[in-house]
């Protein structure tokens, strides 16, 4: 899987971010990998205000967070893999040296050529026919597509592993030597210099201080089936909330895809999404998400009681705090309803449009406006806010040995439900 992921530059590029759930057969547990990028230390509200921006840009160097995919791949391989980095990256290096471009990717590049032309390095690699007189600038389907700089970087990682092996390092240490070269060595120096030359903010210290986080996943049992999701830095727990709500209904009796069945699914997701948009955020920052209450079966029962035969457009976030023995610190923002319901008493920051993979996101899943409502603050990198990831990965334990893995694309429409 890791070797395949290393070749998927169209959707899992090395400048992007990675999330994963891993089943550990010996320990018989699910492990969560958080390789989400963080905003660079210079990406403060004051900085964007000084540029006359109300929002961080959608594209380009100022939109970039620290790359998480390289670190995520290397840590997963070091901690839980068996192959060497050289073995894993061999197919990726071969493809970077040149391969026949597939039609789908060729079409995607051509469709985005105007955007790619804004950035000289992107245009040089992705638009090899940029000086041609005809309209087409990107590679043709079947044309040999080469990325020599990427191949050179991948070879540097393999070289770092080989040098560490010669020094007598363990398998894990050799792979982490490649990690250090990317985030603290010559690759980091070159990366930061290139970003800054184009007006970006990522520094060498930003890269050096970034870490992959190995976490405990969130978990519920749905009718005896264990379901695992990543934490509230993704929207994954909203699926767990929806399943808890649906457990209060006899879906089988409704009939698969009947009007009542679809209505009930929609309403369960509507309720869980309302909680997601209000309560979810970066777990590294206060206030702590009321995740125990949100995933409580009793809270789900109270939310399920709100589902009626017709859609209720007034549905808002509920109050999960009593279901974990706490009081809600946001009562000034919500008006208490009945049965665990609550309605917004004032508008929150507007929800953001679907972001591209390189767009920084606020931890609550909305893009904050950069105006007087935002504090002027700059975090040390260890505390930097991470982007809110709208894609999500599931591991579903059907029984003692049977597993299902469900993944949906980024975008926030349906979290693998």
Indicate where each model-derived feature is located.
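Short alpha-helical scaffolding segments that buttress acidic/His motifs in well-ordered protein cores
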Residues: 1-2, 92, 242, 268-272
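A short acidic/small-residue loop/turn micro-motif
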Residues: 38, 412-414
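Generic beta-strand/beta-sheet core signal
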Residues: 205, 210, 223, 228-230, ...
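A short, polar/charged loop-to-alpha-helix boundary motif
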Residues: 43, 414-417
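Short glycine-rich loop/turn motifs
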Residues: 17-19, 215-217, 239-240, 390-395, ...
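M16/insulysin-pitrilysin zinc metalloprotease superfamily fold
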Residues: 236-252
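Noncatalytic scaffold domains of N-terminal-nucleophile
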Residues: 2-177, 182-234, 295
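Internal maturation/activation junctions in enzymes
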Residues: 188, 192, 200, 251-410
């Amino acid at each position: 899987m890791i070797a395949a992921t290393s070749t998927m530059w169209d959707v899992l590029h090395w400048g992007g971010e990675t999330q994963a759930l891993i089943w550990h057969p010996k320990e018989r547990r699910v492990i969560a990998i958080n390789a989400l990028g963080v905003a660079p230390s210079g990406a403060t509200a004051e900085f964007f205000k000084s540029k006359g921006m109300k929002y961080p840009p959608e594209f380009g160097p100022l939109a970039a967070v620290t790359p998480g995919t390289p670190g995520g791949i290397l840590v997963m391989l070091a901690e839980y893999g068996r192959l060497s980095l050289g073995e894993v990256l061999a197919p990726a290096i071969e493809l970077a040296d040149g391969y026949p471009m597939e039609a789908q990717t060729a079409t995607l590049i051509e469709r985005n050529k105007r955007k790619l032309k804004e950035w000289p390095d992107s245009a040089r690699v992705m638009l090899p026919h940029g000086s041609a007189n005809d309209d087409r600038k990107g590679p043709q389907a079947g044309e040999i597509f080469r990325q020599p700089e990427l191949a050179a970087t991948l070879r540097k990682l393999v070289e770092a592993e080989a040098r560490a092996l010669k020094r007598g390092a363990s398998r894990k240490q050799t792979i982490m030597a490649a990690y250090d070269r990317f985030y603290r060595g010559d690759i980091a120096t070159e990366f930061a210099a290139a970003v800054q030359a184009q007006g970006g903010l990522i520094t060498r210290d930003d890269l050096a201080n970034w870490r992959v986080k190995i976490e405990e996943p969130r978990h519920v049992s749905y009718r005896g089936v264990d379901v695992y999701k990543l934490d509230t830095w993704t929207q994954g727990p909203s699926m767990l909330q929806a399943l808890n709500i649906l457990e209060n209904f006899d879906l089988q009796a409704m009939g698969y895809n009947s009007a009542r069945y679809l209505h009930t699914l929609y309403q369960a997701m509507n309720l869980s999404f309302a909680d997601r948009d209000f309560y979810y955020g970066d777990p590294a920052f206060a206030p702590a998400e009321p995740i125990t209450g949100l995933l409580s079966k009793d809270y789900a029962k109270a939310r399920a009681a709100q589902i009626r035969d017709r859609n209720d457009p007034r549905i808002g976030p509920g109050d999960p705090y009593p279901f974990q023995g706490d009081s809600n610190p946001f009562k000034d923002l919500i008006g208490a309803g009945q049965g665990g319901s609550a309605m917004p008493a004032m508008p929150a920051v507007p929800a953001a449009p679907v972001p591209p993979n390189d767009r920084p996101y606020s931890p609550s899943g909305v893009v904050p406006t950069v105006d007087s409502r935002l504090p002027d603050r700059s975090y040390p990198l260890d505390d930097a806010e991470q982007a809110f990831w709208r894609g999500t990965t599931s591991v579903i334990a059907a029984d003692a040995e049977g597993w299902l893995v469900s993944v949906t694309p980024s975008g926030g429409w349906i979290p693998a439900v």
